Amino acid sequence: PVPLRKIDRKREKNPGWYKGNDILGMMMYTDAFAGTLQGVKEKLDYVKSCGVNYLHMMPLLESPKGRDDGGYAVADFRKVKPELGTIEDLKELTSLCHEQGISCCLDFVMNHTSEDHAWAKAARAGDPQARSRYFFYDNWDIPNKYEETTPQVFPTTAPGNFTWLPDCNQVVMTTFYPYQWDLNYANCMVFNDMVDNMLFLTNCGIDVIRLDAVPYIWKELGTKSRNLPQVHTLVRMMRLVSEIVCPGVLLLGEVVMEPAKVLPYFGSVDKPECHMLYNVTTMASTWNTIATKDVGLLRRQMDQVCALPNEYVFLNYLRCHDDIG
């Protein structure tokens, strides 16, 4: 769209537009904040009056009720939950935000889809091409080998990394919840189609793509299937695509891990990956300081952050929907 190309051109002339300290962000659930996307439009004056110029809308794409993981089990990357509105409503909202100098962020859940996604439904029905988009197995032999080295994300509420599907006599990889099927990025169709979905959202006016659970997107037997080199290759490719197609859009990586594992997601000066990463450690250290009334840990951590190259841009935040740990 022409208005978005104009934004791209403006940001290309000022590539450091997001690196200052003049961006104040707000996270919100559409239904809790204003009921619908139309309701958010009607509250933009209030948002602006708070000094907010960065609006992170929590997951609002179509996902099955009762099996949506807060919207992180996406059934269709090109439809909004009906109770919140439509894709056209989203486009209108982002356009109004841009008129008021507000950038818009949306989660891009790239590790998995809902079991209700069209690909998953076809895979469950036996389509071999659709099954190749996920990790399907006839028995537990290979899944059990994965389990020997792969940590569990939710060992209490969703133990294991695989789920048995009795209706089709198959085992499928489900790192998070049983209704979230992991995508197989070794299949180039998956990468191509998911990047196409990402670009669809940028054409809806999304300025910041939050790459959800990015360390998990590549799996390999005999490893923890976290932070593997192929993950960085995929993120680097996404960065290259975005710089060509939508150069004004930022990639924000969600890497909730210790600092040594977070920094590599910036890439390098000549081969950049994410534009921004969450400053997870500072957030946790801030709450530790409040609880202990001891600034020592926070001071040491901030000294480490300030010693990093200027090219590294962190999104500093106080809290989010995830736990503090």
Predicted regions and their residues:
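Acidic/aromatic-lined carbohydrate-recognition and catalytic surfaces
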Residues: P1-N192, L199, N203, V214-N288
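Catalytic-core regions of glycoside hydrolase
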Residues: D294-L297
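Generic recognition of flexible, low-complexity loop/linker segments
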Residues: N14, D196-N197, L240, D303-V305, ...
